[in-house]
Amino acid sequence: MIEVGEYKIKEGLYYTKEHEWVQVLEDGTVLVGITDYAQKELGDLAYVELPEVGKVVEKGDVLCEVESVKAVSEVYAPVSGEVIEVNEELADSPEKINEDPYEAWIAKIKPKNLEEELKELMDAKAYAEYLKTL
């Protein structure tokens, strides 16, 4: 784990400037969630609008929304592909994202252009440097 101030960054993941993370699984699918920075900025999450299984997204499309006491925030697709699974636990327990943002994934995506799109994402060290600029 890398720490930047109060924010934790899990190594081995890829990150976006919009504070989503991507974990590449052995079968070539990816898990997507929001970072520690994102959940702390949002505050206590009250609701996660999970995407539909089967939804096809392009990188940068709105994947879903998360709602906190403070704000509603869009979560963007960090890679293009098809949503093949969602984390149903979050429907009843959105606070799991606050408790452990790197375990509480939102969606599993079957990517269509992963190798190319990963090049556009940051690794943990680059994301840590990015957080220092905020």
Curated annotation (Swiss-Prot):
Keywords recorded for this protein, A-Z: Lipoyl
Origin: domain of life: Archaea
Residues recorded with modification N6-lipoyllysine: 70
Annotated GO biological process: glycine decarboxylation via glycine cleavage system
CDD domains attached to this UniProt entry: GCS_H (cd06848)
InterPro entries: 2-oxoA_DH_lipoyl-BS (IPR003016), Biotin_lipoyl (IPR000089), GCV_H (IPR002930), GCV_H/Fam206 (IPR033753), GCV_H_sub (IPR017453), Single_hybrid_motif (IPR011053)
Electron transport keyword on record: no
Pfam families: GCV_H
GO cellular component: cytoplasm; glycine cleavage complex
Gene3D superfamilies tied to this protein: 2.40.50.100
Names of required cofactors: (R)-lipoate
Family assignment from sequence similarity: Belongs to the GcvH family.
Cited function: The glycine cleavage system catalyzes the degradation of glycine. The H protein shuttles the methylamine group of glycine from the P protein to the T protein.
Protein name: Probable glycine cleavage system H protein
Native source organism of the sequence: Pyrococcus furiosus (strain ATCC 43587 / DSM 3638 / JCM 8422 / Vc1)
Lineage: Archaea, Methanobacteriati, Methanobacteriota, Thermococci, Thermococcales
